[in-house]
Amino acid sequence: MLGRKQSVRNNEDWKNALDHIEETVSKKELDSLVKKTVKDIKEKCKGKKAAYAWSAGKDSLVLGEICEKAGIDQSVLVRCNLEYPAFIAWIEQNKPSGLEIINTGQDMEWLKKHPDMLFPDKSNKAAQWFHIVQHRGQARYYKEHQLEILLLGRRKADGNYVGKD
């Protein structure tokens, strides 16, 4: 098992986990978990305006598939102007049909004024970055679309707060 995402240091570990996934979790067990999760989302979102946050990462790809199965087809991706062009192209080629992209505008000029954000080596700096970009953009989307629920792909195994049941 991989454990915390931050502790996986190379891509080979991810590839190995994928190549041997059925040794860890069977297709039958995975299908059962997906079915249960879809049911839970439907119950919690019934009659509420909901969307999901999509980052184009591994966790959000799974979240998107599950949300779509639960009937939630609106999503948001928050980015800035510091993304690699290849990543932006990948997003355009693979984004969900109901995706809205919010650009919070941080660019090279912004980075020159905030050099401590270039390679944040402390968790509080990384958290500050997520607040500046992700959280503000998600809050804007939530408010503009008058949502009641925004589903996020967070993992307990990584120590993330996942809300109350």
Language model segments and positions:
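ATP-dependent adenylation/nucleotidyltransferase module used to activate substrates
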Residues: 1-165
